Structures are given as structure tokens and as C-alpha cells.
């Protein structure tokens, strides 16, 4: 796991010679723009050029842009003005500067990263997209991982027949837009590396329709701001209909690299790694710190047993805040249900996925998938006729001709699950601090949220979380899994400091302090 840093773009042939056959190379390039042209003479250099050409499609001038490289490495392009700041928030990366670059980060020690801890073993709790991607990010770098799943693989929020991979972004610079753009290319490349096209996913593209004036304005702004973008471009109603192969009622924004993915196929592929052991139908009853290790008390259908690990990563979605050390943390639960249906034999199916106030995919394994419903604070994960009716009503409203061509006479078909979300609709990703200790150390924040505290964060050694991806897990969870692996292994983070802090788990308990709120966090049970 060697890190190669370049100030400016290296020549592809020279880079290929330098890294040789290193499958875990971490390549950092500090540069403001992409080179106008890329050429190489050697076969290895030409492969690097091809990768960079693919990656450039997804680059949108982000401060930190990451893209998978070879089997277990990555390529990171960093804007020069954020480089020193980014290095200082990356334990394990050599920092030549002794002066903090941005003083506004100094009084938020709870939003930093802990020092590295020697790895003895890793347990990941949850076998959805977040848990599988986290385990895979570690396993492909030689770390053995045990994944514990209370039910079966991809049975909760990752259990839809098909989900969409595309980025519904704002026309303005927001944290969520930065995250979605960062995750889009990363997920797309990782997916392509894991599964051949057609085996668990459709390389079909996505049209986001201008189904109301607000969406039309947003999509027009995006297209006008990025006229040369290969990532997306505006299409007229006629052009959209030609792409989709069916008559569409609106113009829209065409995302040619969007995809429709069967999450189970992708998750199973990642969990097949030989260094990953998966324990399904296994409930975690308790987690506690014993000497220098975490003890995870489990029970399956046959026996009760315990596992020990130097590192734990909680990826349990809506079940996450039932587990120490984040038990009682303020995470929101949102019920969602998708519907599947067959298309009538004489009808023409859409050639691409369509998105409006809901979505519909092309056919995969004889079923199209559409929805989904959105019901905050509901925790029933059974299929219901009410949600089925709602999905059909939405589809008939914005795509009446397509809805009429689907078979609606079958009994309930689809998937229902509980999504996990945070107050700001951003994932919760990173190392976990000791909640009770933070409440004591940072109590002054109750009186003044800007009080310049310098007390180091009381970290829980080796404890991490990757959850609260809502309905966007396919695009955000793999990138966040890479960020977790980087933190554990001391590798370069794929996230900017801005994103690291915006997603940091400790923002939740600290917000309780600054908003004069309390919640019943749990102490460890032993």
C-alpha cells in the first residue's frame, strides 16, 4: 500500500514504470486542472491514460476527486489550495507543514481523526451496501473481516429489485452535491470492476424529467453551468423520447453513465472475497470494550458466542442506533416501498431508467421496478397495499402510457424496508467518540457553540460507523467505505476535509449539546 505523490501531472509512462505491478498504489496528484492531452507509448502507460480518460468524465472541479485504480488502490486529484489542509486531516500521511492551515478547524477537535491503531481483526456489523463495501475496501487490501448480519444479505434498505445510480444534484454548491458527485464516479468504476455489464446491473443511463417548473429550472441551470460536461446534458422532449424508446411527456437532463443496479448482486460479489467471512441470521446482543479489544456478543439459531476485534464498523442502517457505542444517537427512520411489475407482451419497455418524483427502471429478470414511497417515522417493513397503490398512482400521474402497459393485476410485488437518515440528510461516516466523555469535555458548548475548545476528542479506539445513507446508498456508501478503510489503514482519504467534517459521526452528539437537547445514550453493557 504505497503512496505516490506528484505536484503536477506525471507522464503516464513514467508513472507506470514507477509503480510497476503495485495493485494497491495510492496516487495523489496535486493539480488545478486536467491536462489537455494524455499520451503514452508503453502498454502499462496506455492503460493509465485510459483510466484517466474515464475518470475525467466524472470530474466536476471538486476540491478532492477520487477514482479506483487497479484492484485495490485509488487515484486522487487534489486542488493545490486545499492540499496542506487535507494532509493535516489524514493521519498516516506525511505532513511537512507545522502550522495549521485553516484556524476554523482547530476548535473542533471532535471532527478530526484519531491516531492509527494496530489492526488485529475487524468486525463489520451489517451486510447491506455499506457493510459489504466497507468489508470489501479492507479485504482487498489484505485485511480479514467478519461481517455479522442479523437477517440475510441485502435484506433491508439494500433489498430492492433495482435501484438507480445517478446523482440528483443541486445547481448550487452544497455539501450534498459535493458528496454525490464524489460518490457517483467512484461507485460507477467500482461497480464496473466488480460485475460485467448485464450481470446484476443495466448500463442504461438515466433521464431526470422536467416534470415541474422547479425541476426544469434546476436542470437548465445545471446544463448551462456545465455546457461541456460529458456527465450530463439537457435533452428536449423529442430527444428524451428517442433515448428512452417510448414517448415521454417532458424534456429532461440525460445522465448517460447512470445505471440500474440489483443491489443484492453487487453486495454478494463483494462479500465473496476470500478474506471476508459472513455470519447471517446472527444477532448482536452486546458490544463492549475488554482490555484492548472489542467484544461482540452474538447469537444465531444454534448458539451464543463472542467475537473479539481491534476494530468494529457499524453499518446496520436503521438498526445502528440500537448498538453500543451509538445506541440512542438521533438517527431517523423512514419507511420506503418499491413495486415490481411485468410489462405486457406487446408493449415496448423503456430503454433507460426514468426519474421524476419517483423512478422506474427498464426490465431486469422480467420485472420493472418503480417507486418509492417515503414515510418518516414509520418502522413497519411489511409490504402494504396502501404503499403499492401510492406507487401506481405516482407512476400513472407522470407516465400514464407506460403504467397502462404494465401488468397491475398481480398480488403485492416489491420490497419494503426502513431507511436510515440523519437530521441534515447526510451519511454518518467516520470514527466514533465516547459520547458520555464528550458531553463532559465539551459541556461549554451548551452555553456557546463557538467556544474555542482545544481538548482532544475522547475516541473509542477502533470504533467506526458507516450508516444513514437514506435512499442514496448506491452512490454514497462505497466512497464512504473507502474513507473508513483509509482511516483505519492510514491511507489517503478520498474525501475533502469539508466532507470529512460534514459526515463525521461526532456531529450528532455535539449538536445535542449546542441545541440544548438530550438523548438516552447507552453505556457499554459490561
Regions found by a protein language model. Name each.
Residues 109-117, 123, 130-141, 150, ...:
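Active-site substrate-recognition segment that forms the wall
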Residues 174-183, 211-216, 253-269, 382-387, ...:
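Short beta-strand to alpha-helix junction loop
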Residues 29, 124-125, 147:
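Hydrophobic Val/Ile/Leu positions in short beta-strands of Rossmann-like dinucleotide-binding domains
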Residues 406-526:
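C-terminal catalytic lobe of FAD-dependent flavoproteins
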Amino acid at each position: 500500500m504505497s503512496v505516490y505523490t506528484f505536484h503536477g501531472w506525471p507522464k503516464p509512462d513514467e508513472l507506470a514504470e514507477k509503480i510497476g505491478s503495485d495493485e494497491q498504489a495510492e496516487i495523489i496528484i496535486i493539480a488545478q486542472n486536467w491536462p489537455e492531452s494524455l499520451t503514452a507509448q508503453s502498454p502499462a502507460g496506455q492503460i493509465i491514460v485510459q483510466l484517466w480518460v474515464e475518470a475525467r468524465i466524472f470530474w466536476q472541479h471538486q476540491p478532492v476527486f477520487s477514482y479506483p485504480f487497479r484492484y485495490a488502490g485509488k487515484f486522487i486529484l487534489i486542488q493545490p489550495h486545499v492540499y496542506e489542509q487535507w494532509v493535516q486531516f489524514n493521519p498516516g500521511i506525511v505532513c511537512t507543514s507545522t502550522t495549521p492551515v485553516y484556524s476554523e478547524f482547530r476548535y473542533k477537535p471532535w471532527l478530526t481523526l484519531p491516531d492509527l491503531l494496530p489492526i488485529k481483526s475487524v468486525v463489520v456489523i451489517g451486510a447491506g451496501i455499506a457493510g459489504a463495501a466497507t468489508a470489501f475496501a479492507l479485504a482487498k487490501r489484505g485485511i480479514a473481516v467478519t461481517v455479522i448480519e442479523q437477517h440475510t444479505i441485502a435484506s433491508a434498505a439494500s433489498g430492492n429489485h433495482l435501484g438507480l445510480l445517478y446523482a440528483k444534484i443541486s445547481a448550487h454548491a452544497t455539501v450534498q452535491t459535493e458528496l454525490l458527485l464524489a460518490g457517483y464516479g467512484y461507485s460507477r468504476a467500482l461497480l464496473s470492476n466488480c460485475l460485467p455489464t448485464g450481470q446484476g446491473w443495466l448500463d442504461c443511463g438515466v433521464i431526470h424529467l422536467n416534470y415541474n417548473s422547479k425541476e426544469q429550472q434546476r436542470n437548465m441551470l445545471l446544463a448551462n453551468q456545465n455546457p461541456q460536461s460529458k456527465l450530463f446534458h439537457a435533452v428536449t422532449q423529442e430527444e428524451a423520447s428517442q433515448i428512452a424508446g417510448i414517448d415521454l411527456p417532458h424534456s429532461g437532463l440525460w445522465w448517460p453513465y447512470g445505471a440500474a443496479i440489483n443491489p443484492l448482486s453487487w453486495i454478494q460479489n463483494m462479500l465473496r472475497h476470500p478474506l471476508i467471512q459472513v455470519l447471517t441470521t446472527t444477532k448482536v446482543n452486546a458490544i463492549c470494550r475488554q482490555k484492548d479489544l472489542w467484544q461482540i456478543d452474538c447469537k444465531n439459531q444454534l448458539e451464543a458466542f463472542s467475537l473479539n476485534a481491534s476494530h468494529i464498523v457499524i453499518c446496520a442502517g436503521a438498526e445502528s442506533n440500537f448498538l453500543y457505542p451509538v445506541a440512542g444517537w438521533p438517527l431517523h427512520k423512514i419507511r420506503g416501498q418499491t413495486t415490481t411489475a411485468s410489462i405486457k407482451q406487446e408493449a415496448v419497455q423503456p430503454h433507460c431508467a426514468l426519474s421524476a418524483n419517483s423512478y422506474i427502471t427498464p426490465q431486469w429478470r422480467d420485472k420493472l421496478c418503480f417507486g418509492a414511497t417515503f414515510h418518516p417515522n414509520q418502522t413497519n417493513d411489511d409490504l402494504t397495499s396502501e404503499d403499492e397503490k401510492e406507487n401506481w398512482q405516482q407512476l400513472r400521474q407522470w407516465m400514464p402510457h407506460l403504467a397502462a402497459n404494465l401488468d397491475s393485476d398481480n398480488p403485492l410485488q416489491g420490497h419494503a424496508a426502513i431507511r436510515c437518515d440523519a437530521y441534515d440528510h447526510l451519511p454518518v461516516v467516520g470514527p466514533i467518540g465516547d459520547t458520555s466523555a464528550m458531553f463532559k469535555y465539551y459541556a461549554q458548548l451548551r452555553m456557546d457553540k463557538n467556544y474555542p475548545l482545544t481538548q482532544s476528542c475522547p475516541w473509542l479506539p477502533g470504533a467506526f460507523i458507516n450508516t444513514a445513507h437514506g435512499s442514496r446508498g448506491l452512490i454514497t456508501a462505497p466512497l464512504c467505505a473507502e474513507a473508513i478503510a483509509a482511516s483505519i489503514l492510514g491511507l489517503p482519504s478520498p474525501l475533502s476535509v469539508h466532507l470529512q467534517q460534514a459526515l463525521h459521526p461526532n456531529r450528532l452528539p455535539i449538536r445535542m449539546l449546542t441545541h440544548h437537547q438530550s438523548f438516552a445514550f447507552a453505556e457499554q453493557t459490561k
